[in-house]
From Swiss-Prot:
Residues 404-494 are annotated as: Contains the Ser-Pro(4) repeats. The lineage of its organism: Eukaryota, Viridiplantae, Streptophyta, Embryophyta, Tracheophyta. Transmembrane segments: none annotated. This is Leucine-rich repeat extensin-like protein 4. It comes from Arabidopsis thaliana (Mouse-ear cress). Residues 422-479 have a biased composition (Pro residues).
């Protein structure tokens, strides 16, 4: 009797579970906006398919035997796209309504081209579902699209994680997942994409650290702004060959690595609204090609280096909302292409007259005598009475391995005189090693209190260096894919 009761309870629980699952699926399949509860349900549902981090997640796609495909690769693409269609839970614009049948090259948002390794066959080379407002997740079967060069799904409602099987996309050139609801740790699968040049993860919910290997990849553009990443920039940051990197609105802290000045290809860099708390590298002026330089809304200290006057291509320069001090060098305000110089909300005490003749500048809330809208004398006195900053105390340079002291071999004893018994020689004592007296301790001022600001969105980014040419498409091209990265950053999605 007891066993029958237990079985009845189990059956009842299973009934309620499946009823809950079906009711949620039906409600989510409607065109109404997804609530936060439904988003969490989708994320849980996605995780149910994972057996472990590297396990398969199948969508049980059945291929109708009556369907005829041009080649096996398009058959694999059909499986991938049908699995994705099953994983889509809301498609208010009916983008995927024509994802039916074997002619996948006619699917909306799918673009075919001749295979690079066999020009006689067509294969799926690009997917562009930007601004489609689709909700769902990315199934593992997308790894079957092994000829894919472009994958653009920005401004949708995809959530969950990036499939591990993406590592099979060896030809993937551009990956744009921006302005969605992806979450979890940094998708390390992107480190295994050998052809990747453009990576856009901005406006998502990724969190944790960013692997330092990202900055060793041969990328041209990195957008990871507006996430929840929290880490210190690694020493190899300057090894990155990118022309554009945007890290704004995360939780980075610590140093701006001195290796930054070695980024010879860099055109645009935006660090705004993080927690960086060091000095600017003294030789920052070596960045001769930078047009946009934004380190606003951080906790940077010390002077504005004189070498900034060597950034001859800079057009937008923003160091506002920091703890910088000293005088603004005249050479900065004389930069030939400078259009906008913002240095408000710091503690600068002097600026060259030429700075006041710039077409656009902002010097408010400093300690500049004779200028309007400055800090109070009390604020300025309190800050400027602190000990001067020792920029070397932050240890922001690459670590240097000190070589071991050379081993000095003692000279061999002279040969003994024949008529005398050989004398016994004791090796001479080693010369005393002089230890210099310890240098006096360098006073490091206490770190400034954390300052939290309400940050505006980053300035529009204008990219100037196009990547290598994308593969040719036989069908209509998606709008502006990979040419100068002209798509504006998506708005925050809340």
């Amino acid at each position: 009797m007891k066993n029958n009761t237990t079985q009845s309870l189990l059956l009842l629980l299973l009934f309620f579970f499946f009823f809950f699952e079906i009711s949620h699926s039906l409600s989510i399949s409607s065109n109404a906006p997804l609530s936060d509860t439904e988003v969490r349900f989708i994320q849980r549902r996605q995780l149910l398919y994972y057996r472990d981090e590297f396990g398969d997640r199948g969508e049980n796609v059945t291929v109708d035997p009556s369907l005829i495909f041009e080649n096996p690769r398009l058959r694999s693409a059909y499986i991938a796209l049908q699995a994705w269609k099953q994983a889509i839970l809301s498609d208010p614009n009916n983008i995927t309504v024509n994802w039916i049948g074997s002619n996948v090259c006619n699917y909306t948002g799918v673009f075919c081209s001749k295979a690079l390794d066999n020009r006689k066959i067509r294969t799926v080379a690009g997917i562009d579902l930007n601004h489609a407002d689709i909700a769902g997740y990315l199934p593992e079967e997308l790894g079957l699209l092994t000829d894919l060069a472009l994958f653009h799904v920005n401004s949708n409602r995809f959530c969950g994680t990036v499939p591990h099987k993406f590592k099979q996309l060896k030809l993937l050139f551009e990956l744009d997942l921006s302005n969605n609801r992806f979450a979890g740790k940094f998708p390390t699968v992107v480190l295994h994409l050998p052809s990747l040049k453009f990576l856009d993860l901005r406006f998502n919910e990724f969190e944790g650290t960013v692997p330092k290997e990202l900055f060793s990849k041969n990328l041209d553009a990195i957008f990871i702004n507006h996430n929840r990443f929290r880490f210190e920039l690694p020493e190899n940051f300057g090894d990155s060959p990118v022309s554009v990197i945007v890290l704004a609105n995360n939780h980075f802290h610590g140093c701006i690595p001195t290796s930054l000045v070695e980024m010879k290809n860099l055109n645009e860099i935006i660090f705004m609204n993080n927690g960086l708390n060091s000095c600017l590298p003294a030789d920052i002026g070596r960045l001769k090609n930078v047009t946009v330089f934004d380190v606003s809304f951080n906790e940077l200290v010390g002077p504005l280096p004189e070498s900034v006057g060597g950034m001859v291509e800079v057009e937008q320069l923003n160091v506002a909302h920091n703890l910088l001090s000293g005088k603004i060098p005249a050479s900065i305000c004389q930069l030939p292409k400078l259009e906008n110089f913002t240095y408000s909300y710091n503690f600068f005490t002097g600026e060259a007259p030429v700075c006041l003749r710039l077409s656009e500048f902002d010097d408010r809330r400093n300690c500049l005598p004779g200028r309007p809208a400055q800090r109070s004398s009390r604020q300025c006195s309190a800050f400027l009475s602190r000990p001067s900053v020792d920029c070397g105390s932050f240890g922001c340079g690459r670590s240097v391995v000190k070589p071991s002291p050379p081993i000095v071999a003692l000279p061999p004893p002279p040969p003994p005189s024949p008529p005398l018994p050989p004398p016994v020689y004791s090796p001479p004592p080693s010369p005393p090693v002089f230890s210099p007296p310890p240098s006096p301790p360098v006073y490091s001022p206490p770190p400034p209190p954390s300052i939290h600001y309400s940050s505006p969105p980053p300035p529009p980014v204008h990219h100037s260096s196009p990547p290598p040419p994308s593969p040719e498409f036989e069908g209509p091209l998606p709008p502006v894919i990979g040419v100068s990265y002209a798509s504006p950053p998506p708005p925050p999605f809340y």
